[in-house]
Amino acid sequence: MTDTPTKQETQSNKDNVPGAIPVEQKKNNRNDRKRNRRGDSKNLERDSDWQERVVQIRRVSKTVKGGKKMSFRAIVVVGNEKGQVGVGVGKAGDVIGAVRKGVSDGKKNLVRVPLTPNNSIPTLSKGRDGAANVLIRPAAPGTGVIAGGSIRTVLELAGIKNVLAKRLGSKTPLNNARAAMVALSQLRTHKSASRERGISLEQLYS
């Protein structure tokens, strides 16, 4: 009568096989894969918070020794509608590559915008880029975004719901978008303004 091997003996024999992966290592690998899946899902949730809008796509050329080299330039506005917005420019041989580079460039140049409880801006602000001048001022609830072109796109993706904007000077989309970014970057809350000036809020309003 032969003795049948127990489960522990069978498992130990499997572990002793050359090239076999131990049970503990298999469990650790399984746990690592689960953690990676959780991390990927969190990254997808973070990416889903961001929105991107293409303001302009142009076909541009560069004169080189062998002739003209054609490429595409994309102006992209990136924002999470929660007070963060950025403007990026991307160039590539195809449209998809140019947009992808524009999104990456926009996320590198983000600006934090202080929003009021009415989803407006705290104070009036001006911005300039090149020959473009942009004036933005707060508005009452229910006003909406009174702006046009690339300025409207920047304000909407920043999360501003009630604002008045005026474009002065150049009409180019890139300069106007950058001028709006300059105006938003200069915004300060009343508390931060009083702190920078070294006065109280009562003195600021008086």
Swiss-Prot record:
<dbReference type="GO" id="GO:0006412">
    <property type="term" value="P:translation"/>
</dbReference>
<comment type="subunit">
    <text>Part of the 30S ribosomal subunit. Contacts proteins S4 and S8.</text>
</comment>
<comment type="function">
    <text>Located at the back of the 30S subunit body where it stabilizes the conformation of the head with respect to the body.</text>
</comment>
<dbReference type="Pfam" id="PF00333">
    <property type="entry name" value="Ribosomal_S5"/>
</dbReference>
<feature type="region of interest" description="Disordered">
    <location>
        <begin position="1"/>
        <end position="50"/>
    </location>
</feature>
<keyword id="KW-0687">Ribonucleoprotein</keyword>
<dbReference type="GO" id="GO:0003735">
    <property type="term" value="F:structural constituent of ribosome"/>
</dbReference>
<keyword id="KW-0699">rRNA-binding</keyword>
<dbReference type="Pfam" id="PF03719">
    <property type="entry name" value="Ribosomal_S5_C"/>
</dbReference>
<dbReference type="InterPro" id="IPR018192">
    <property type="entry name" value="Ribosomal_uS5_N_CS"/>
</dbReference>
<comment type="similarity">
    <text>Belongs to the universal ribosomal protein uS5 family.</text>
</comment>
<keyword id="KW-0694">RNA-binding</keyword>
<feature type="compositionally biased region" description="Basic and acidic residues">
    <location>
        <begin position="38"/>
        <end position="50"/>
    </location>
</feature>
<dbReference type="InterPro" id="IPR020568">
    <property type="entry name" value="Ribosomal_Su5_D2-typ_SF"/>
</dbReference>
<dbReference type="GO" id="GO:0015935">
    <property type="term" value="C:small ribosomal subunit"/>
</dbReference>
<feature type="domain" description="S5 DRBM">
    <location>
        <begin position="50"/>
        <end position="113"/>
    </location>
</feature>
<feature type="compositionally biased region" description="Polar residues">
    <location>
        <begin position="1"/>
        <end position="15"/>
    </location>
</feature>
<dbReference type="InterPro" id="IPR014721">
    <property type="entry name" value="Ribsml_uS5_D2-typ_fold_subgr"/>
</dbReference>
<protein>
    <recommendedName>
        <fullName>Small ribosomal subunit protein uS5</fullName>
    </recommendedName>
</protein>
<dbReference type="InterPro" id="IPR000851">
    <property type="entry name" value="Ribosomal_uS5"/>
</dbReference>
<comment type="function">
    <text>With S4 and S12 plays an important role in translational accuracy.</text>
</comment>
<dbReference type="InterPro" id="IPR005712">
    <property type="entry name" value="Ribosomal_uS5_bac-type"/>
</dbReference>
<dbReference type="InterPro" id="IPR005324">
    <property type="entry name" value="Ribosomal_uS5_C"/>
</dbReference>
<dbReference type="InterPro" id="IPR013810">
    <property type="entry name" value="Ribosomal_uS5_N"/>
</dbReference>
<dbReference type="GO" id="GO:0019843">
    <property type="term" value="F:rRNA binding"/>
</dbReference>
<keyword id="KW-0689">Ribosomal protein</keyword>
